Design a protein with these regions (language model features):
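C-terminal segment of N-terminal export signals and the immediately downstream linker at the start
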Residues: 27-58, 76
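Glycine/proline-rich, positively charged
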Residues: 69, 120-233, 239, 249-250, ...
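N-terminal secretory signal peptides and thylakoid transit peptides that target proteins
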Residues: 2-21
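Glycine-rich, proline-tolerant flexible connector loops at the mouths of alpha/beta enzymes
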Residues: 83-102, 152-155
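Conserved, mostly hydrophobic/aromatic
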Residues: 48, 60, 82, 97, ...
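Alpha-helix-loop-beta-strand connector modules within alpha/beta enzyme cores
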Residues: 98-114, 169, 173
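Structured C-terminal cap/extension of enzyme domains
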Residues: 48, 200, 218, 222-396
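Hydrophobic faces of well-ordered beta-strands that scaffold small-molecule active sites
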Residues: 56-60, 82-84, 113-115, 147, ...
Length: 396
């Protein structure tokens, strides 16, 4: 995948791949040492597969954010791609982006909008069409560049004829451009292969980090060869703040390093990151404009080694072993949002939306076959009970 060079030659970047013990380093050349970031940065815009869209190497992830001022600041910094969703809080993110774009005049023509909704088997054609129209209204626009079927867990979630018929109708009317999927499932490899074979999906918007999914790069290469573009998110591999702070010595930034790492993959077009204040816009713009250093590579290796038996890869092995049907992956994700992403209210809301039989209350008195099932040696039952305590503000 070619990228349009503006300042930094990324041919000297090292290619990193996930292995069982941490991060493996390969590729050619010598890593550049970290540079001091200035207040303005220039970075690349990469083609998003065969869509014809050019996306900024970092994109604005607006998860749960109602800040049109930040969105305008990101545009001023050169970020042209915004990832929002119609799923949360009555489309709050879409409304905020719509407000931000309403002040741009002709500049709004440069904005690439990525949004979507949960679309599942059994959903009606009219519901799909209504959801697309609702997103258009909230965004104050007449066209969505990429429309995602969100939070796809397995290939079965792609067997929705109404999705493809509804998308085709909306595309014929000029309302949407390209169909994609978003996912952070543990079964990423079979899902993405199924999506490639599906023939309808043009864009992947997926979790990608240096600890999980050792076979993911081969799948992304296959997708790229067929013209499917890839955007990624959650590059921080759990975002465990205490461990990160211990590693950030000598002015290193762990979040910046993970973005730089993801951009070493030529099959990744853009990294979506949560930009919650003006400083994060500056930090992530700087990350896209500067190479990955040898010190940053060492930091990522140390983190991967330390987190080997503590970071949930959402592989699903433990959940499959649970005799009580506990939603292990969802609960672990909500606990991560609560403890490490500053999204406490959302985490609690989503946990309490689970069916009662799927909550971690069911872990009381269980012998914990999930512990033995985890291929990474995590103490799954204890972590689920702790998650329940956090998300309920009371003991299980």
């Amino acid at each position: 995948m070619a990228s349009h060079r503006r300042t930094i030659d990324r041919r000297n970047f090292l290619k990193l791949g996930a292995v069982a013990s941490g991060v493996a380093v390969g590729g050619c050349g010598t890593p550049e040492e970290a540079t001091t970031a200035s207040s303005t940065f220039e970075f690349d815009y990469r083609p998003l597969g065969d869509t014809g869209l050019e996306v900024s190497e970092v994109s604005f992830g607006a998860h749960g954010l109602d800040r049109p001022d930040l969105m305008r600041a990101a545009l001023d910094a050169g970020i042209n791609t915004f990832c929002v969703s119609g799923n949360y809080l009555d489309g709050m993110e879409e409304k905020a982006l719509g407000e931000a774009m309403s002040t741009l005049g002709s500049r709004r023509d440069n904005v690439v909008i990525v949004t979507g909704n949960d679309i599942r088997p059994g959903m009606s054609l009219q519901r799909v069409l209504d959801d697309i129209d609702a997103s258009l209204r909230r965004l104050r626009t007449d066209h969505l560049h990429v429309y995602l079927t969100s939070d796809v867990r397995a290939s079965e979630d792609l067997r929705v004829d109404a999705l493809y018929e509804g998308f085709d109708r909306a595309k014929e009317a000029g309302k949407v451009g390209h169909l994609g999927l978003s996912s952070h499932t543990g079964g990423m490899q079979p899902l993405l292969n199924a999506a490639i074979d599906n023939g309808h999906i043009e864009v992947f918007f997926i979790k990608y980090d240096f600890v999980s999914y050792p076979d993911q790069d081969a799948i992304l290469r296959r997708a790229a060869e067929l013209g499917i573009g890839t955007m990624v998110f959650k590059t921080n591999a759990g975002n465990r703040q205490r461990e990160i702070k211990d590693l950030e010595a000598g002015g290193l930034s762990f979040p910046q390093a993970t973005v730089k790492w993801a951009l070493t993959n030529p099959y990744v077009s853009s990294v979506s990151v949560s930009m919650t204040n003006f400083d994060t816009i500056r930090q992530y713009s700087a990350a896209a404009a500067t190479p990955l250093s040898s010190a940053e590579i060492a930091m990522l290796r140390r983190y991967a080694d330390e987190m080997y038996d503590r970071y949930c890869r959402f592989c699903g092995e433990c959940e499959a072993s649970c005799p009580r049907g506990v939603a292990v992956a969802d609960i672990n994700r909500f606990a991560m949002y609560f403890s490490y992403y500053g999204r406490e209210k959302e985490a609690m809301r989503r946990y309490h939306a689970l069916p009662d039989r799927c909550s971690a209350k069911a872990c009381n008195g269980c012998t914990g076959p999930c512990d033995a099932a985890c291929p990474f040696g995590r103490l799954v039952r204890a972590e689920l009970l702790e998650a329940h305590r956090l998300l309920c503000f009371k003991e299980a």
